[in-house]
Amino acid sequence: MDIIWSNGCYDILHRGHLELLKYARSLGDKLVVGIDSDKKVRKSKGEGRPVNNQDDRKFFLESLIYVDEVVIFNTPKELEGRVESIRPKFIVIGCLLYTSPSPRD
């Protein structure tokens, strides 16, 4: 099974997000989306953010047909651990596409 990973804050979900997720899902069999915790979004984007809390953002993404699983992370170490555990074939972030650095079993 080819797993695809995408992550971001996904606050104020818009057409660009949806197009990205649709494209990401087309690359494999399962799309896992990581979202920044409220604390992480506030730290990077400032007070008043996120507009939608992490539970709502998770719910919105889980409601999309392109998304198979959503996880919330708070630190770069948590993000790294999650990506290492699922070993995605591709990582899609914004307009960037990364391939796995080594063959998967």
Named regions from a protein language model:
Residues 58-73:
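Short acidic amphipathic segments
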Residues 45-51:
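Short glycine-enriched, charge-decorated loop/helix-capping segments at active-site entrances
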Residues 1-35:
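N-terminal catalytic cores of NTP/NDP-binding nucleotidyl/phosphoryl-transfer enzymes
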Residues 58, 79-80:
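Short hydrophobic/charged patches on amphipathic alpha-helices used for structural packing
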Residues 98-105:
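Conserved small/polar residues in nucleotide/adenosyl-binding loops
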Residues 35, 74, 94-96:
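Short secondary-structure boundary segments
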Residues 83, 87-93:
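Proline-aspartate-enriched helix->loop->beta-strand connector
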Residues 39-45:
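A short acidic, helix-capping loop that chelates divalent metal ions and anchors anionic groups
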